[in-house]
A protein has these predicted regions:
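HIT superfamily nucleotide-processing domains
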Residues: 1-145
Length: 145
């Protein structure tokens, strides 16, 4: 636990929390690339993938399986997913020095890849907070089923 770390401070992301296990938080990003964008954050503070415990890794994997399993059953045309993590300083894209992994559930009807959106954030509409909140509530309900 690091008192200066955003992901160690539960209050800083509690409004984004979709699911919590004994060792993992599932967070909906403040600026999602698209609706099915998730962040898996180990509760254990470690800056890099290779730094956190095997127990946390096992729990994070189980949480990923749970999310993919629940949402794949929703018949929304999911065709797979991407996992992305940045390990290093800000120059490699790791803005918070606490390991976390982004998951993008991919759909057969998507018009633009999340990688294109990540590389050109002008293509995403950050101004629509109502849509983000509606997406968050829908996802939270699906994951609770």
């Amino acid at each position: 636990m690091n008192s200066k770390c955003e992901f160690c401070d539960y209050k800083s992301f509690s409004q984004q929390l979709l699911l919590e296990t004994s060792r993992t938080y599932l967070i909906y990003p403040r600026r999602p690339i698209f609706t099915y964008h998730f962040m898996f954050v180990p509760k254990e503070h470690a800056p890099y993938f290779i730094s956190f415990s095997d127990e946390s890794l096992i729990d994070m994997k189980a949480t990923m399986k749970l999310v993919v399993g629940k949402l794949s059953k929703s018949k929304e045309g999911f065709i797979g997913y991407n996992l992305v993590s940045n390990n290093g300083d800000k120059r490699v894209g790791q803005k918070v020095p606490h390991y976390h992994c982004h998951m993008f559930l991919r759909r057969d009807d998507e018009e633009i890849s999340p990688y294109t959106l990540m590389n050109n954030r002008d293509l995403t509409d950050d101004s629509d907070g109502e849509k983000r909140e509606a997406d968050f509530n829908i996802l939270k309900k699906k994951l609770a089923e």
